């Protein structure tokens, strides 16, 4: 009976790890058809941000130049304009299809992530007892470590996450999350998050050391500052 009770938190922890993947896969399959039909049946206006509008205009200009060059070389001047209009019309339809697919992709990923967050939040609330058991195990494990190992681990973690060499890693991670929600890549927003988010984390971490560790384990704080210096 005791072994069974000890196994339940491990099962709960494994379910938390694999549940987001399962929710994402299930929601993508179930919501894709509904979102696609809903998007295609509505007479929605086309909203483009500055990046999408600039990219679309560049594609049209490149397309027009390529068609003009190609048709002027191969055909007589009297016929190349007609083929130019036909070619641009076909490419315009392809651009519209690409835009619709991109919008559907954005809505699908955003809806899936929100739904996944809601389900995981409810799952965590329902599994509060298992989380308390896992938390007690983690605290017991950390308590058995020496202050030197704790200080080294804290220093290593902070250097990896909020050190001077971490911006590239933050850029990749924020870019991945930004893309996972289906948003168009925006260097300005990503750069702004990379330059501010680690600074906020660093401030919170230093405040945590000052308020919590100074009270719980002053020797750990002394060792941490000694290693850091």
Curated annotation (Swiss-Prot):
UniProtKB keywords: Antiport, Chloroplast, Hydrogen ion transport, Ion transport, Membrane, Plastid, Plastid inner membrane, Potassium, Potassium transport, Transmembrane, Transmembrane helix, Transport
Ranges that cross the membrane: 6-26, 114-134, 189-209
GO biological process: potassium ion transport
Entry GO MF terms: antiporter activity; proton transmembrane transporter activity
Entry keyword RNA-binding: no
Alphabetical list of Pfam families matching this protein: CemA
Topology within the bilayer: Multi-pass membrane protein
Location(s), subcellular: Plastid, Chloroplast inner membrane
UniProt keyword Nucleus, yes or no: no
A GO CC term assigned to this protein in UniProt: chloroplast inner membrane
Primary site of residence: plastid
Catalytic reactions on record: K(+)(in) + H(+)(out) = K(+)(out) + H(+)(in)
HAMAP family: CemA_PxcA (MF_01308)
Role: Contributes to K(+)/H(+) antiport activity by supporting proton efflux to control proton extrusion and homeostasis in chloroplasts in a light-dependent manner to modulate photosynthesis. Prevents excessive induction of non-photochemical quenching (NPQ) under continuous-light conditions. Indirectly promotes efficient inorganic carbon uptake into chloroplasts.
Sequence similarity: Belongs to the CemA family.
Name of this chain's protein: Potassium/proton antiporter CemA
Gene name in the database record: cemA
């Amino acid at each position: 009976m005791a072994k069974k009770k000890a196994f339940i938190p491990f099962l709960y922890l494994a379910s938390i790890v694999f549940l987001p993947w399962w929710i994402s896969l299930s929601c993508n399959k179930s919501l894709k058809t509904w979102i696609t039909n809903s998007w295609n049946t509505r007479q929605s206006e086309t909203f483009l941000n500055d990046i999408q509008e600039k990219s679309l205009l560049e594609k049209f200009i490149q397309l027009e130049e390529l068609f003009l060059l190609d048709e002027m070389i191969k055909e007589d001047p009297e016929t190349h304009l007609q083929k130019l209009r036909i070619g641009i019309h076909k490419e315009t339809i392809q651009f519209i299809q690409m835009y619709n697919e991109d919008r559907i992709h954005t809505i699908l990923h955003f809806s899936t992530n929100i739904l996944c967050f809601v389900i995981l939040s409810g799952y965590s609330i329902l599994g509060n007892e298992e989380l308390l058991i896992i938390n007690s195990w983690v605290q017991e494990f950390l308590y058995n470590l020496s202050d030197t190992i704790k200080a080294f681990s804290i220093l290593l973690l902070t250097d990896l996450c909020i050190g001077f060499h971490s911006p590239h890693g933050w850029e990749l991670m924020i870019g991945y999350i930004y893309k996972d929600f289906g948003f168009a890549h925006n260097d300005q927003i990503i750069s702004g998050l990379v330059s501010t988010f680690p600074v906020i984390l660093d401030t919170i971490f230093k405040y945590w050391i000052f308020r919590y560790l100074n009270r719980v384990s002053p020797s750990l704080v002394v060792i941490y500052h000694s290693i850091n210096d």
